[in-house]
UniProtKB/Swiss-Prot annotation:
It is found in: Nucleus. One of its GO terms (cellular component) is cytoplasm. This is DNA-binding protein creA. Keywords: DNA-binding, Metal-binding, Nucleus, Repeat, Repressor, Transcription, Transcription regulation, Zinc, Zinc-finger. The lineage of its organism: Eukaryota, Fungi, Dikarya, Ascomycota, Pezizomycotina. One of its GO terms (molecular function) is RNA polymerase II cis-regulatory region sequence-specific DNA binding. PANTHER family: REGULATORY PROTEIN MIG1-RELATED (PTHR47428:SF1). SMART domains: ZnF_C2H2. One of its GO terms (biological process) is carbon catabolite repression of transcription from RNA polymerase II promoter by glucose.
Amino acid sequence: MQRAQSAVDFSNLLNPTVPADKESEKPHQGDVEMATAAVTVIKPNGPLPGVQNSENSNELPRPYKCPLCDKAFHRLEHQTRHIRTHTGEKPHACQFPGCSKKFSRSDELTRHSRIHNNPNSRRGNKAAQAHQQQQHQMHQQQGLPPHMMPDGMMAPPPAPKTIRSAPGSALASPNVSPPHSYSTFALPVSAVHYNRGGDISMLAKAATQVERETLTAPPHHSNNHRHHPYFGHGMHSSRGHLPTLSSYHMGRSHSNEDPSDDHYSGAMRHAKRSRPNSPNSTAPSSPTFSHDSLSPTPDHTPIATPAHSPRLRPFSTGYELPSLRNLSLQHNTTPALAPMEPHLEQNQFQQGSAPTTQPRPTGMSLTDIISRPDGSQRKLPVPQVPKVAVQDLLSDNGFSHSGRSSGTSSLAGGDLMDRM
């Protein structure tokens, strides 16, 4: 009985009939109905009434609905925050200086502010350092000029700074500047010298230190007050070592400059040792050159120009130029400046500096040629050999009578004077 029954069951499985198909479809239909019921429960827009009644007892009501979508919120703040996601509005801006970020939510702003407030954050340190550097640069650009300059003068102070480090630079003012314009340049430097605060640049501090090192003789302070009434009170501590260079354009009203020249030649001999005759030689970077370039002299050589400038002849006094010539000579055999008016002073200084040029009767003309600042003009005494040849031509016996008469040598000297 069991075998037949199993055989029938096996045959039914191999060849299924229509009622068997219907019986197999019934559980499948039941699964589909359960899935549709589950979908209706999960669907937010159409929940089942029984499920909604069970959830209302646990959740708060959501009266605030978004007008742009189907979402509802418990509080008004949540609704407004959600609406900003649709509009793109970002009302919460970062208040930290230098940061321009904006956020739509306040919690995002507080989370962002921790970047600036946290000292351990690398990003916050970088942003803070960049902001401090920007503020420091702005203070330097905006805050320094009122401290360094008096009212109404914005442009002059950069000029003395650039002239201090470059003696022969072209940044100087025109060489015919009157004394009143020179005082406008000198007064801001005195203001920089006395405003020893945090606003003064490092260049000004270094310049004042160099000035203090180069000041060797204290009597210049009284002489400076005597020679410079325009800016004597402001410049007596930093400009005391220049009594004669700047007194070229001030010397018409001050003719008693003998002791100042003595002090100048005695004290500044060590400070100006590295500047013999050439304009390109090195010299200490002090504000001395601002006086030279701003005085009415040409710009190429500060010391050797007064001999060749026609504007300085009425301003110079008797003992002014020889003292500068003695200063510039020091160890040389040829004078750096041509003799100006008196001849006794030249002989007096040639005894101390160049005793070899005295025995010649034509030494004045030769020194005038030798004292030219150009090297090519300084080599003009080479025609001494043609001078001997001219004497040989004038004399009958050649070199035996070459030193016979002083007229031939004076003729040769006059020829050299005519060449000038």
